[in-house]
Swiss-Prot record:
Pfam families (alphabetical): Ribosomal_L29
Presence of keyword Metal-binding: no
Annotated Gene Ontology cellular component terms: cytosolic large ribosomal subunit
GO molecular function (one): structural constituent of ribosome
Gene of this entry: rpmC
SUPFAM superfamilies: Ribosomal protein L29 (L29p)
Gene3D superfamilies, sorted: 1.10.287.310
Native source organism of the sequence: Xanthomonas campestris pv. campestris (strain ATCC 33913 / DSM 3586 / NCPPB 528 / LMG 568 / P 25)
Protein name: Large ribosomal subunit protein uL29
Amino acid sequence: MDIKQLREKSADELKAHLTDLRKEQFSLRMQQVTGQLPKTHETRRVRREIARVKHLLGSTQ
């Protein structure tokens, strides 16, 4: 998701999105450990999006 789209969301929506991203990150980690992750770049994408959301949550408070 683009930073512009994230800025349009409310704090509650960002927190919900962060929860979803962390679940996705956990799932990707498990797939990577078991050797079932075909697209390794997804872990990097999720990690960066988590950082974007956390940055926006910190700046709005």
